[in-house]
């Protein structure tokens, strides 16, 4: 058999097979019937004669049938007219007894004129006369033959009737029949047996489908064709039960046994956690169709609820067992719980939705097969209709008469005061009219349109004063004919009752307010009683109410089931995440910073070469022994939080309502908040102690990602900047899942700003609280003192002579004693301090700290803000600007700290050079060169410039430092020169001081500003109005006053001299002109030394 036959056999129409045992062939069982038939034949007198009709039939079979050939007896027409086809031939044939002359003339010769008819009559008379003559001639010519035939017939009749020939023939036939019976009786009995066997085979072939059903059902089950198995099972029960044959009961028992095993298999599939969703749907749908049977699962009830409850019990048991596993750390248990939830709950929820809605999807292959059958049936119907139409057209063409289809105008009214008119014939139905009317509406998914018969009847009251209108709406069936209804209403023509068609949606209510006549007035009275009758309305309403109640109950049960699972999962995860007895996660405590401090210290190791190696910004390397790695803990926290968020998003993605997810939403929020606080606190704490990792290593390696990224204008930074940026980025990356939760970002932003500010604290600690930096001043002074002693010994310079006033000398003595005590204490501290590295001195470390601070202010803070925006897709607030402003203040403080240290060293040189250098300002010769202490100071400034460029390579910082030192240099020179006793100052001494000032101004010309210009003018005025006599008169007689009073007194003398406006004979302009050649000569000699100051 072909594959098509096999496929069709799976869905055979078993209704065609019936058990009919009376349907057998009837054949004679004995030859006695033949004998009886022969006797009857002999007794029949007409048996040997052939009737005239039979003879005409036999002759007609041999001859050509020309009865359809047209012949006009009048000889006028050769072709029949169209009207003749619809008239009976008996009425037109002259030889027929029912010939009608009127019909002949009206149908055949209706268009023939009178002249032709007259000629035809003559011809007809001639033919009649000639035919009579022919008959007479025939009889005359063959008269002898007629007489002989008559005599022969008489003789044959006498011979048969008078002789015994017929009896002898009858006896011979009887003998033949008896002998045939003897011979053929066994054959006939065998034939009867064969017929009985054939009948049994026929029945077996007819009901072979029933016998094959057990095997077919088993084959369908093996191939997972559950729909076919259910189809065959139901049809087998129908056929066997309707036949009521005991022979088929055994087959039915076998089928029931197979079905029971199939039910057990389906229930086991429902209880198996690895069963896929499609298989679950098929299993539940199959069980709902074939029932639970009579076995162990007969009392289960609804198979879908059995699956839901079984799966619920399995999930809750697994969650409890997993959460109580003490062999795994908490973060791994949380991971297993999340995997368990994601692998079971989605399928459980989807099946629950089908359970609530009370429907399951059908098998696509089975539906496709049914659709193909329907399409084939429709095609066959269309072919039949086309053939019928062709036949009708051919009949109409043959008859020459086309019948016009009758039709009527049908007016359909709508609720929006409009109506439509359609032409309907007898073949159109109500469903066709509905399709025409619904084209004017915009349909929605749930719309259902109906056509109603609107009947209106007015009833007068007994006193005939009021009239009540009764309106009745009757829904029309789709098979009714609008043509017949319209004709019926037109034929009645009743004045007391009106009918019309109304088209509307089924859920729309019909009221008298929305029914208006064409003129705008209401058709119905306000007292109209409206009754709407729908097809099967009461049954549909009852079914809808029961379905709604069942769905609500199922939804409540299933909702509680899902909520219980979510609450159990949330409680276990929260308990594991916040369990204080475990060491898997760090908890908030008062000693958190101290623990982190110890951890950072423990992760710092020194190799044999003295180079420090430490962990990255994310938490450092591993400690020793039992030390917990905070980086691993944070990673585990990130994984757990992401797993819980993934569970939440996946459950939301499958359409689970928020009511079901309330517990997991609360869990997610709690974990996220705790995780954010933990990560932010770790980030701030790590940044707070980064100064411990400062080993003053320069970012010179090209492999370092931050070697060029964090440098401003080519400034050099240390690897501490990389540690800082890595720490921030690593911790922020752990919070990347907050990109779609902008409401939680303010705390992260605040923590980022706090971390940047904490890094500023680290820089402040490195700049101001480091003991090695505190010793910078003393190191510089000691080195300067040693250099000067060596220089004096080599050059043979005379010892220092103090030319200051007695008060100033006493004050200097006190200052020296105090400085000696401070220096002794700091030296002791310096001996006890330890350094991580000796590669950079204290000044260079201070410059590197300044460079790091400038980098944070100028670039790193902006880069971190960009990283934050790119990571979370949210802008930052204005708090970061305030933090940058604070760091800018710190940058200026560090710069001033460095400048003050250098100014202190330069100020000591100025004090020694002006007051204690051993030279005198009371000379009589003109100056020839710049003072040596000025050259020493400028040389120190060259060293400062070189130190800045070598250490941090910053032109801006070097410019700012030199400019500030330049200002301090002028202020200090003016102040110290004002402390010199005027008795020891001559005009030549003033010229020497003016030469020094001019030399400094020319060398540092590029670093001048308004302040230096003012200071230079003040110095010139001091020299111009300095008068020794006035200085003596204003000197205080008492020498026991403090140094502060002395300074105020000298200042008052300076301003009193200015107020007098007198002069001492010293001309600034002339002196400057005289000193110009000497100045140029000294500048040329030192141009190479001070070339770094030329910008």
From Swiss-Prot:
The keyword Protein transport applies. Transmembrane segments: none annotated. Residues 616-626 have a biased composition (Gly residues). GO terms for cellular component: exocyst; Flemming body. Its main location: other. Residues 7-25 have a biased composition (Acidic residues). Residues 1-32, 605-629, 804-835 are annotated as: Disordered. It is found in: Midbody, Midbody ring. Keywords: Exocytosis, Protein transport, Transport. The keyword Disulfide bond does not apply. Residues 807-833 have a biased composition (Low complexity). GO terms for biological process: exocytosis; Golgi to plasma membrane transport; protein transport; signal transduction. Component of the exocyst complex involved in the docking of exocytic vesicles with fusion sites on the plasma membrane. Belongs to the SEC5 family. The exocyst complex is composed of sec3/exoc1, sec5/exoc2, sec6/exoc3, sec8/exoc4, sec10/exoc5, sec15/exoc6, exo70/exoc7 and exo84/exoc8. PANTHER family: EXOCYST COMPLEX COMPONENT 2, EXOCYST COMPLEX COMPONENT SEC5. This is Exocyst complex component 2. It comes from Dictyostelium discoideum (Social amoeba).
């Amino acid at each position: 058999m072909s594959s098509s036959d096999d496929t069709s056999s799976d869905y055979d129409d078993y209704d065609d097979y019936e058990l009919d045992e009376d349907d057998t062939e009837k054949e004679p069982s004995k030859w006695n019937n033949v004998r009886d038939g022969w006797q009857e034949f002999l007794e029949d007198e007409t048996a040997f004669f052939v009737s005239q009709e039979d003879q005409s039939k036999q002759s007609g079979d041999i001859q050509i049938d020309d009865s359809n050939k047209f012949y006009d007896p009048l000889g006028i027409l050769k072709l029949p007219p169209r009207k003749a086809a619809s008239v009976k031939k008996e009425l037109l044939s002259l030889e027929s007894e029912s010939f009608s002359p009127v019909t002949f003339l009206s149908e055949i010769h209706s268009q023939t004129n009178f002249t032709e008819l007259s000629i035809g009559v003559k011809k007809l008379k001639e033919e009649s006369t000639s035919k009579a003559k022919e008959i007479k001639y025939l009889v005359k010519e063959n008269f002898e033959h007629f007489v002989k035939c008559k005599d022969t017939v008489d003789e044959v009749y006498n011979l048969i009737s008078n002789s015994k020939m017929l009896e002898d023939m009858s006896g011979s036939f009887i003998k033949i029949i008896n002998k045939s019976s003897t011979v053929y009786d066994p054959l006939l009995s065998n034939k009867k047996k064969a017929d009985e066997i054939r009948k049994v085979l026929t029945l077996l072939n007819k009901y072979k489908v029933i016998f094959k059903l057990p095997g077919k059902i088993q084959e369908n089950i093996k191939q997972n064709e559950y729909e076919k198995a259910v189809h065959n099972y139901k049809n087998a029960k129908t056929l066997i039960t309707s036949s009521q044959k005991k022979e088929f009961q055994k087959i039915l028992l076998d089928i029931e046994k197979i079905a029971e095993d199939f039910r057990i298999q389906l229930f086991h599939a429902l209880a198996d956690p690895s069963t896929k969703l499609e298989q679950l749907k098929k299993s539940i749908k199959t069980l709902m169709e074939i029932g639970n049977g009579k076995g162990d699962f007969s009392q289960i009830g609804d198979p879908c609820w059995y699956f839901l409850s079984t799966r619920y019990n399995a999930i809750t048991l697994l969650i409890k067992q997993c959460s109580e596993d003490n062999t795994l750390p908490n973060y791994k248990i949380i991971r297993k719980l999340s995997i368990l939830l994601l692998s079971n709950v989605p399928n459980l929820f989807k099946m629950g939705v089908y359970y609530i809605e009370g429907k399951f999807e059908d098998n696509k292959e089975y539906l496709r097969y049914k659709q193909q059958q329907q399409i084939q049936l429709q095609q066959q119907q269309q072919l039949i209709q086309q053939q019928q139409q062709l036949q009708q057209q051919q009949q109409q063409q043959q008859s020459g008469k086309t019948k016009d289809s009758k039709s009527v105008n049908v007016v359909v009214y709508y609720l929006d005061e409009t109506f439509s008119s359609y032409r309907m014939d007898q073949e159109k139905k109500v469903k066709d009219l509905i399709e025409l009317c619904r084209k004017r509406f915009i349909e929605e998914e749930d719309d259902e349109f109906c056509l109603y018969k609107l009947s209106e009847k007015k009833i007068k009251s007994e006193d005939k004063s009021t009239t009540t209108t009764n309106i009745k709406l009757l829904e029309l069936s789709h098979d009714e004919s609008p043509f017949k209804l319209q004709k019926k209403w037109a034929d009645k023509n009743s004045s007391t009752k009106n009918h019309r068609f109304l088209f509307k949606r089924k859920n729309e209510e019909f009221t008298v307010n929305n029914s208006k006549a064409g003129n705008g007035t209401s058709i119905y009275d306000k007292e109209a009683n409206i009754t709407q009758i729908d097809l099967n309305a009461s049954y549909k309403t009852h079914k809808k109410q029961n379905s709604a109640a069942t769905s609500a109950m199922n939804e409540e049960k299933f909702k509680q089931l899902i909520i219980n699972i979510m609450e159990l999962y949330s409680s276990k995860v929260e308990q594991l995440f916040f369990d204080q007895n475990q060491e898997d996660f760090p908890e908030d405590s008062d000693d958190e910073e101290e623990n982190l401090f110890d951890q950072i210290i423990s992760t710092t190791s020194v190799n044999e070469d003295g180079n420090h190696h430490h962990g990255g910004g994310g938490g450092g390397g591993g400690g020793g022994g039992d030390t917990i790695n905070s980086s691993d803990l944070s990673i585990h926290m990130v994984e757990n939080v992401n797993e819980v968020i993934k569970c939440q998003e996946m459950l939301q993605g499958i359409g689970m309502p928020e009511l079901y997810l309330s517990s997991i939403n609360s869990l997610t929020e709690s974990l996220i908040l705790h995780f954010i606080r933990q990560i932010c606190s770790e980030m701030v704490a790590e940044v707070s102690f980064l100064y411990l990792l400062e080993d003053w290593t320069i970012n010179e390696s090209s492999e370092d990602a931050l070697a060029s990224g964090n440098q401003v204008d080519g400034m050099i930074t240390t690897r501490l900047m990389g540690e800082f940026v890595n720490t921030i980025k690593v911790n922020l990356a752990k919070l990347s899942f907050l990109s779609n939760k902008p409401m939680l970002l303010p705390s992260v932003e605040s923590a980022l700003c706090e971390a940047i500010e904490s890094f500023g604290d680290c820089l402040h600690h490195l700049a101001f609280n480091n003991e090695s930096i505190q010793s910078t001043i003393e190191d510089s002074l000691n080195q300067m003192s040693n250099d000067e002693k060596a220089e004096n010994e080599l050059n043979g310079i005379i010892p220092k002579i103090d030319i200051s006033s007695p008060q100033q000398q006493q004050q200097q003595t006190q200052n020296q004693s105090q400085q000696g005590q401070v220096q002794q204490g700091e030296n002791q501290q310096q001996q006890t301090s330890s350094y991580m590295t000796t590669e950079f001195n204290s000044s260079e470390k201070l410059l590197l700290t300044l460079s790091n601070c400038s980098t944070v202010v100028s670039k790193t803070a902006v880069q971190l803000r960009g990283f934050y925006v790119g990571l979370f897709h949210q802008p930052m607030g204005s708090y970061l600007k305030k933090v940058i402003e604070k760091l800018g203040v710190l940058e200026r403080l560090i710069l001033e700290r460095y400048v003050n240290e250098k100014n202190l060293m330069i100020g000591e040189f100025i004090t020694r050079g002006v007051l204690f250098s051993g030279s005198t300002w009371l000379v009589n010769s003109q100056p020839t060169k710049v003072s040596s202490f000025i050259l020493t100071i400028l040389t120190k400034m060259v060293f400062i410039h070189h130190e800045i460029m070598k250490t941090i390579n910053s032109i801006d910082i070097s410019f700012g430092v030199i400019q500030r030192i330049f200002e301090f240099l002028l202020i200090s020179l003016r102040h110290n020169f004002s402390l010199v006793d005027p008795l020891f100052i001559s005009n030549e001494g003033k010229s020497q001081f003016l030469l020094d000032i001019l030399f400094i101004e020319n060398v540092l010309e590029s670093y001048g500003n308004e302040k230096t210009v003012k200071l230079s003018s003040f110095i010139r005025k001091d020299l111009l109005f300095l008068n020794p006599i006035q200085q003596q008169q204003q000197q205080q007689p008492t020498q026991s006053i403090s140094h502060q009073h002395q300074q105020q007194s000298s200042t008052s003398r300076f301003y009193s001299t200015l107020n007098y406006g007198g002069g001492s004979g010293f001309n600034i302009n002339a002196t400057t002109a005289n000193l110009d050649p000497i100045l140029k000569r000294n500048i040329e000699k030192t141009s190479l030394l001070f070339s770094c100051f030329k910008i």
